[in-house]
Structures are given as structure tokens and as C-alpha cells.
Amino acid sequence: MNTSHIVLMICFIVGVGQTALALKEDDCEVCVKTVKRFADTLDDATKKDYKLIETAFKKYCKTQKNKEHRFCYYLGGLEESATGILNELSKPLSWSMPAEKVCEKLKKKDAQICDLRYEKQIDLNSVDLKKLKVRDLKKILNDWDESCDGCLEKSDFIKRIEELKPKYSRNEL
């Protein structure tokens, strides 16, 4: 009887410990969001075969930019990737493993995967563009896939952003 209590206590402690160690979306945000977004693009036939998942991921990576592109590089989804741990993504996805668990396994293989973080978005409706640095103004345009040909002064960048703002800003009511 006493031994069974000890075994139950150990099982409880291990269970609580595993829950505490479980990866949260904020801990590995780029990985979790990218894996979820990629998994949503797969059809039922592709989801069952890890080789097809790998091929689909390489195709998916060709269209990615910024942090997602870096994530693809780390996994081996790009031609120029130095290493490849793509099977650590494709096999668990073929077993219908949730994105959080997939990223947990990937983190064990390569910790820098979870070091990727999204940059905080600038709220264009509330920020004073004149107080931003030129680097930040350029980043806004770059995020929009827009350029500012002939822009030399800060005021030129601000003028260009103001021109494009109605096209890209999200007005929340």
C-alpha cells in the first residue's frame, strides 16, 4: 500500500513537470505559427506521407520572407540551407502532431529555431512618423514590399508612407 502511494506521487510529479515544460506559442512563436500555417495548406493525401510533406514544405518556403524564411533555412527547406532536419517536421506532421509539440521536438534538435521572434508591429494610426528613425521608416516600406525611389530625406520617406497608408493600414472599428 505504501509503495503504491509513492508510485502515484511520482507519476503525479512527472505529469505536472511535463505540463510545465510544454512549449507555449509565445516561447516559439515563429515556429508554431509557421508550422500551423503550413499544415493548413496541406490536403489530406499529402498529410499522410512525410515525403510529400517535405516536398510541399520546400515549395512553401520559396514564398516565405523574413522570420519564416529564416525558419525554413534552419530546417533545411531552402536550397541554400546548410543543414537539414526536415524529417523532424514532416514525420510528426504526418502523425497529426500539434504544432506546439512539433516545435518542441525541433527545439531539442536546434535551439535557435525558438530564438526567432516576430518584431513588434508599429501602429501607424497612433505613431508619430516624425519621431521614428529613417531605418524604421524604411522597414515599414519594406514590410509592405514598397520602395521609395529618390527618397533621401526623412520627410521623403514620411511622405511616401502617408501616400501608401490608406492601402496598407488596418482600421479597427
UniProtKB/Swiss-Prot annotation:
Pfam families xref list: ARMET_C, ARMET_N
Alphabetized InterPro entries for the sequence: ARMET-like, ARMET_C, ARMET_N, EF_Hand_1_Ca_BS, EF_hand_dom, SAP_dom_sf
Subcellular location: Secreted
GO MF term set: calcium ion binding
KW Signal (keyword) present: yes
Disulfide bonds: C28-C114, C31-C103, C61-C72, C148-C151
Keyword annotations: Developmental protein, Disulfide bond, Secreted, Signal
Signal peptide start-end: 1-22
One GO CC term on file: endoplasmic reticulum
Main location (coarse class): secreted
Record bears the keyword Secreted: yes
GO process annotations (BP): dopamine metabolic process; dopaminergic neuron differentiation; neuron cellular homeostasis; neuron projection development; synaptic transmission, dopaminergic
Stated family: Belongs to the ARMET family.
Purpose of the protein: Required during the maturation of the embryonic nervous system for maintenance of neuronal and cuticular connectivity. Essential for maintenance of dopaminergic neurons and dopamine levels.
Protein name: Mesencephalic astrocyte-derived neurotrophic factor homolog
Annotated organism of origin: Drosophila virilis
